[in-house]
A protein has these predicted regions:
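Metal-dependent nucleotidyltransferase catalytic core
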Residues: 6-21, 59-97
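A sequence-composition feature that detects small, non-aromatic residues
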Residues: 11, 21, 30, 42, ...
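Active-site nucleotide-donor binding segment shared across nucleotidyl transfer reactions
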Residues: 20-68, 230-232, 236-239, 250, ...
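Generic alpha-helical propensity signal that fires on short helical segments
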Residues: 51-53, 73-77, 127-129
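Catalytic cores of NTP-dependent nucleotidyl/adenyl transfer enzymes across multiple folds
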Residues: 90-256
Length: 256
């Protein structure tokens, strides 16, 4: 069941907005703007049970202005409007980005500079859901979690995919540490945005070094520890995966 909010229609796919997001990505790609869905959307694609308020669409940083202008120009301005930025504190710069809303619906999306999620947004790094939505390849997404020291996302994608430890040794760059200089830049920009208006929300990224391999090992070795009495280990293999279930990204879903 979907609920109508005042005069607004629910987003597509029972309020999820999945086909709405697909339309936006196709508009961008038709104008030679590569893109991929990141943040909570990527976590859902890779099996995590998360609630998604807004769709985060990563775009090459140098093309953000072009994308924002495209969506505010005819004919697309008839369907989308620029709205107030993301209103809540978060370990990110979401509050500094272009945020759009589907006119007459409760579909929201945010244009995210790819450098701010430590992803190179190019076709070779992108895979697609069965609906055709673009997502970062699994190795690309997990590498970004390690490089940005986003251990919450890392935990969720590990539990959504149930990857073994050796997968990381074969597919990830585990030597060294998270990108401290990247984090310092994120924190600097977050604190300076609008003359320091949001500085009290800091930090926006963790800028202390931590071993990539240590982060990876600590999450893949503790999957069972994150089960509780509601998810017994004779039914669940991780907090998000039931034993024997197919990989979520291999099935057609209204969520992705």
């Amino acid at each position: 069941m979907t609920w109508k909010l005042g005069d607004e229609e629910p987003a597509s796919n029972g309020g999820r907005g999945t086909d709405d997001a697909l339309t936006v990505t196709r508009i961008l790609e038709a104008s030679d703007i590569p893109c991929c869905l990141v943040g909570i959307s990527a976590l859902i694609f890779y099996g995590a049970a998360r609630l998604r308020p807004d769709w985060e669409i990563a775009i090459p940083t140098e093309l953000i202005g072009k994308a924002a202008q495209l969506l505010q120009s005819e004919p697309h301005s008839a369907n989308y409007s620029l709205v107030e930025p993301w209103p809540e504190p978060s370990m990110s710069l979401l509050h500094t980005y272009h945020r759009f809303k589907g006119k007459g619906t409760n579909f929201y999306f945010i244009l995210v500079p790819a450098q701010d999620v430590h992803i190179v947004c190019e076709p070779s790094n992108i895979t697609r859901s069965l609906r055709g939505l673009p997502y970062p390849k699994l190795s690309v997404f997990i590498q970004s979690c390690l490089d940005t020291r986003n251990e919450l996302q890392l935990c969720d994608v590990v539990d959504g995919t149930d990857l073994p430890e050796e997968w990381g040794e074969e597919n990830l760059q585990l030597e060294g540490f998270n990108d401290v200089e990247w984090a310092k830049d994120i924190n600097k920009r977050g604190c300076e945005f609008e003359n320091g208006k949001f500085a009290h929300w800091s930090p926006f990224a963790w800028d202390a070094p931590k071993s990539r391999r240590e982060m990876w090992q600590s999450k893949v070795r503790t999957k069972k520890d994150r089960l509780d009495w509601t998810k017994p280990d004779h039914v669940y293999i991780t907090q998000y995966r039931i034993i024997g279930d197919p990989d979520p990204w291999t099935i057609l879903s209204d969520d992705y």
